[in-house]
Design a protein with these regions (language model features):
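Conserved PLP-enzyme active-site core in the AAT-like
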Residues: 93-316, 348
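Conserved small/polar residues in nucleotide/adenosyl-binding loops
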Residues: 416-418
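Glycine-rich phosphate-binding segment of PLP-dependent enzymes
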Residues: 26-27, 31, 61-62, 71-93
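Long amphipathic N-terminal alpha/beta scaffold segment
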Residues: 36-75, 104
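Long amphipathic alpha-helical segments
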Residues: 1-48
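Conserved C-terminal alpha-helix-loop-beta "cap" of PLP-dependent enzymes
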Residues: 341-413
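Short Gly/Ser/Thr- and Asp/Glu-enriched loop/turn motifs at secondary-structure junctions
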Residues: 4, 59-63, 122, 274-278, ...
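Conserved PLP-dependent catalytic core of the aminotransferase class-I/II
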Residues: 143-144, 306-309, 313-365
Length: 418
């Protein structure tokens, strides 16, 4: 059988992959004991797959702002590496408190007594419940059946609660939960807490009823209980800013600040959704409870990296200084239809491929605002008439990721941060 060597395969390849990986791919293909032509073809295909799988910057033209598979919120990362005073008191030249400035500025933004940061919002919920069980002696979690959620990636709320060793007490029905349901559960389950979950990735309409945070707070106070609000999506942008920028799709979306004002002892939310920063979980509220979470043995296993904390600090500062529009997510959302049309025109003026500019809608994605859309003009190109276009887009120096709809390549420019 005509064979080819590893060196021969590797020498003829132009790739940015480390040589050791290329050699490994070549050896794997040679071990299949095929003829030279087949080996070369298999090697090229495997190398192609590896190259596409390398984590890299891409251009999101899908029309989904918080695309979970593309990293959710786009950010301006200004941290260039090196050492950082993440836990250092520069003034006194000694060890200091971890991310002290971020804590202060986030409390100022949210109106919270204290705050802490973990690596994602699932961790926020888990470490909160575990701490309230271990430190505060809670034995069960009371939750409405209409709020027992599942989100992308097979995250199911009951499974998280089960891992905390707390008993989950389901109350009400899918569409209706009343204050009397909570009251009955509190009486029947000693040392319980109430968990209210924001249905950020689906909605229930019609014959529905739920209990607001103010009424739940009054109830927990009279029963020596605790009220937790898992907001998930985590809107913190001010109503004044949204009104100024004519953004009305968030009119029915609760903000973190509103949840705290209405009485939630602890509120948790994601940093990479409507907050517009990097993947993280943010827990805000009662100082004593937050301190207990920070002192938990679990906290070190879930805490954020210096890069994440730096970016959270940068994003928080923009909110505090009323410069929300500088946050890439809000800059994209606030862009008006005419601006997008002009952006498309500047690109399509010299575009030789047959195309159409059509009306479409962008969506938030990331498990947020399931029934809301943002009007957006898009470039539509027939995939059937341009069979090589998709390959050219994904093989661009910075891969361009469009979406496919009914054999059309759709390029939405509203998500390109300039």
């Amino acid at each position: 059988m005509d064979k080819i060597s590893v060196n021969k395969l590797v020498e003829e390849v132009k790739s940015n992959l480390p040589r050791e990986i290329i050699v490994s791919i070549a050896q794997s293909c040679l071990n299949e004991n095929t003829d030279s032509q087949t080996t070369i073809k298999n090697f090229e295909n495997e190398l192609y797959k590896y190259t596409l799988n390398v984590q890299k910057k891409v251009i999101n033209c899908t029309g989904t702002l918080l695309h979970t598979n593309l990293g959710r919120a786009q950010t301006d990362i200004n941290f260039t590496g090196g050492s950082t005073n993440i836990e250092y008191d520069i003034l006194n030249n000694r060890r200091g408190k971890r991310n002290e400035f971020l804590n202060q500025s986030m409390n100022l933004l949210l109106g919270s007594e204290d705050v802490c940061f973990v690596n994602n919002n699932a961790s926020s919920l888990y470490i909160t419940l575990k701490t309230l069980k271990n430190i505060y002696g809670k034995k069960s979690v009371i939750i409405s059946r209409g709020e027992i959620i599942e989100i992308g990636g097979s995250y199911r709320l009951p499974e998280i609660i089960q891992e905390t060793d707390l008993k989950m007490v389901e109350i009400g029905t899918t569409n209706k939960t009343k204050i009397t349901d909570y009251e009955k559960a509190l009486k029947e389950n000693e040392d319980s807490l109430i968990l209210k979950v924001h249905r950020s990735n689906f909605s229930i309409n019609g014959f529905v009823e739920e209990v607001n945070l103010k009424d739940l707070k009054s109830l927990t106070e009279s029963h020596n209980s605790i009220l937790i609000h898992d907001l998930g999506s985590g809107l913190v942008a001010s109503r004044k800013f949204l009104e100024k920028e004519n953004i009305d799709i968030f009119d029915d979306e609760p903000t973190v600040q509103e949840s705290l004002r209405q009485g939630a002892d602890l509120v948790m939310f994601s940093g990479d959704k409507l907050f517009g920063s990097l993947q993280s979980g943010i827990i805000a509220g009662d100082k004593e409870m937050i301190q207990s979470i920070k002192e938990s043995p679990l906290f070190r296993t879930y805490r954020c990296s210096p890069l994440t904390l730096f970016e959270l600090q940068e994003t928080t500062n923009k909110y505090v200084s009323k410069n929300e529009i500088e946050i890439p997510l809000w800059k994209m959302i606030a862009m008006n239809y005419e601006e997008l049309e002009n952006r498309i025109k500047s690109i399509t003026e010299n575009l030789k491929i047959k195309h159409e500019v059509v009306h479409d809608n962008s969506v938030m994605g990331g498990g947020t605002l399931p029934n809301k859309f943002i009007a957006s003009p898009v470039i539509q190109i027939s995939e059937l008439e341009n069979t090589n276009l998709m390959s050219k887009l994904i093989h661009n120096e910075i891969p361009i990721i469009p979406r496919i709809n009914k054999n059309n390549i759709i390029i939405d420019l509203s998500l390109i941060h300039i």
